[in-house]
């Protein structure tokens, strides 16, 4: 298995503590409200802390799909959160898992800076498919913007 690491950063007008609360602490209720295509978030294993696996169900192209999301680490004091995609529609056949480490910090005008480190754990040594990476990033960015808009409209 090879591991390929990608770094990303974005800004948001939403304050770090508010964004963290919505994306980590209250995500199971906020995300289905904010994102029409998301139908449910259910815990399939664990108690909500590290090691917990969540099944996130959503509709894409008229078909119900799911993602298995495993919580790796919660660092509320430093606004950090780590999780892995371990199964379902968002995990390409070429990957064993995709791990995401996120960290929020103060940004311009009371907003946030979001730093991401994405680790693609491939099956074998083959690098990830560039088109799959671009499509995944586009979906992730769009999802983030929808949640951000929801938070701005519902302070």
Swiss-Prot record:
**Superkingdom assignment:** Eukaryota
Matching entries from CDD domains are given as: Bet_v1-like
* GO CC terms of this entry: cytoplasm; nucleus
Give any GO molecular function from the UniProt entry. protein phosphatase inhibitor activity
Q: Which UniProt keywords apply?
A: Pathogenesis-related protein, Plant defense
Span-the-membrane segments of this chain are none
Gene Ontology terms describing biological process? abscisic acid-activated signaling pathway; defense response
Induction remarks: By fungal elicitor.
Which Pfam families does the entry mention?
Answer: Bet_v_1
Matching entries from InterPro entries are given as: Bet_v_I/MLP, Bet_v_I_allergen, Plant_def-hormone_signal, START-like_dom_sf
The record ties this protein, via PANTHER family, to: OS08G0374000 PROTEIN-RELATED, STRESS-INDUCED PROTEIN SAM22
Q: State what protein this is by name.
A: Pathogenesis-related protein 2
- Say which species the protein is native to: Phaseolus vulgaris
